Curated annotation (Swiss-Prot):
GO CC annotations on file: extracellular space
Superkingdom, natural source: Eukaryota
Source organism of the structure: Mesocricetus auratus
Alphabetically ordered keywords of this record: Acute phase, Calcium, Disulfide bond, Metal-binding, Pyrrolidone carboxylic acid, Secreted, Signal
Record's protein name: C-reactive protein
Induction details: By interleukin-1, interleukin-6, and TNF-alpha.
Length: 225
């Protein structure tokens, strides 16, 4: 009986653990609107951040229909510690530590789209790049430090640490090539990543990704080069 209980506990532990996998040429597919389907990511680095860059591919038809979350990084002190969010009729909202700036756009084209967002504490400069092309720079949270022990979620926006999901803000579509660095990538580096190059990501590495899938999320081949 004790042996059976021990085996059961081991199996539960495995089911709750983060898998690590090379996700090259694959994508997470969110096929329907939901408040309980998402992917949790585990950061390779647990340190606080004075700068960062997040890059990813997204493929969705939602942008002219409603708003949705692209990348959600929460800490216990701030559910929107880092947030990349599509705001219908407004554009890309990029938040650090709660406050956000808006990069205007009328839609996300209904083709696979590459997005990079970067920020640095020293100047507060926030940048957004779409398919290798920059938006006008903004200023955001100069002097701020991004916290650690993060809950990183794809597919949902966190209104609380690891939860508080709203189906009306969920992603429907594909997301992949999610990488994150603890530096601001240069324009040349952004363009290298945009065309499929690798730059040894220090926080999230798509080629050695630690993740957990919850609900109706599937891993399928990428629909972009």
């Amino acid at each position: 009986m004790e042996k059976l209980l021990w085996c059961s506990l081991v199996m539960i532990g495995f089911s709750q653990a983060f898998a690590q996998k090379d996700m090259s040429k694959t994508a997470f597919v969110f096929p329907k609107e939901s408040a309980n389907s998402y992917v949790s990511l585990e950061a390779q680095s647990k340190k606080t951040l004075k700068a960062f860059t997040v890059c990813l591919h997204i493929f969705t038809e939602l942008s002219t229909t409603r708003s949705f979350s692209i990348f959600s990084y929460a800490t216990k002190n701030s559910p929107n510690e880092i947030l990349i969010f599509w705001s219908k009729d407004r554009g890309y909202a990029f938040g650090v530590g709660g406050p956000e700036v808006l990069f205007k756009a009328s839609e996300i084209p209904e083709v696979p789209t590459h997005i990079c967002a970067s920020w640095e504490s020293a100047t507060g400069i926030a940048e957004l790049w779409v398919d290798g092309k920059p938006k006008v720079r903004k200023i955001l949270q100069k002097g701020y430090t991004v916290g650690t022990d993060a809950s990183i979620i794809l597919g949902q926006e966190q209104d609380s640490y690891g939860g508080g999901f709203d189906a009306n803000q969920s992603l429907v579509g594909d997301i992949g090539d999610v990488n994150m660095w603890d530096i601001v990538l240069s324009p040349e580096q952004i363009n290298t990543v945009c065309v499929g190059g690798t730059l040894d990501p220090s926080v999230l590495n798509w080629q050695a990704l630690k993740y957990k899938v919850q609900g109706d999320v599937f891993i399928k081949p990428q629909l972009w080069p």
